Amino acid sequence: MNQENNKNKISIIGHTKGIGKAIADISKLEVVGLSRSNGYDLSSDIETIMNKLDDCQYIVVNAYAGNNQLELLKRIYNKYQYENKKVAVITSTSGTPQGEDEEFGNATYKEYCQHKKDLIKYIEDIQQELIKKPLSIFDICPDVVDTEMTEGMWDHWPKLKAEEVAECVWLCFEKPYNINKIVIQKNAN
């Protein structure tokens, strides 16, 4: 792969709504969008998605599909650890002890929290290895974001805008150093 060809491309897994769309909207790069809406389902097409990442220096793992977000990240790490790529992974404060809403007893939410915990732990575990490698992986960990996914939920909490999360992704991508983790929370006005 020619490293010069990939400098102007960003792949966003989950690019049509919410945070992924906000990242695509502010991108000055060619966007390689990979979502269910255009035939790339993270639940069943990990190999196909991986093949689309070769030509992209920037990758955003945004789409949530159970444990497949983690499986995709593991494959990205194994394949690209010796390449100069930057990967932003959208995790969630729901995957942290402080962020999980204990009062929200929905089984789907509990499963979501566990998958995000596993994802955050994996990113933490590989950070020491990444110091000696050209690959950068950023844990972008927002609190509640005002998107279709959170409609009608946590309305009593201040919500981040998807654009605010997108700005943090670009902050990480533009820096010459690795920002291991960025936690974003909206304060009440």
Predicted regions mapped to residue ranges:
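Short-chain dehydrogenase/reductase
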Residues: L73-Y77, Y122-E124, A166
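Structural signature of the Rossmann-like NAD(P)-dependent dehydrogenase/reductase core
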Residues: I12-I13, V60-N62, K86-S92, S136-C141
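C-terminal helical subdomain
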Residues: D139-I140, W154-N189
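Short, flexible catalytic-loop segment of classical short-chain dehydrogenase/reductase
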Residues: P142-G152
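Adenosine-cofactor binding site in Rossmann-like domains, unifying the SAM/SAH pocket
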Residues: E30-N51, Y64-N67, E71
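N-terminal Rossmann NAD(P)H-binding glycine-rich loop of SDR-like oxidoreductase domains
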Residues: N8-K28
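A glycine-rich helix->loop->beta "capping" turn
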Residues: S35, I49-V61, K85, N178
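Catalytic loop of short-chain dehydrogenase/reductase
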Residues: N68, Q81-I131, D143-V144
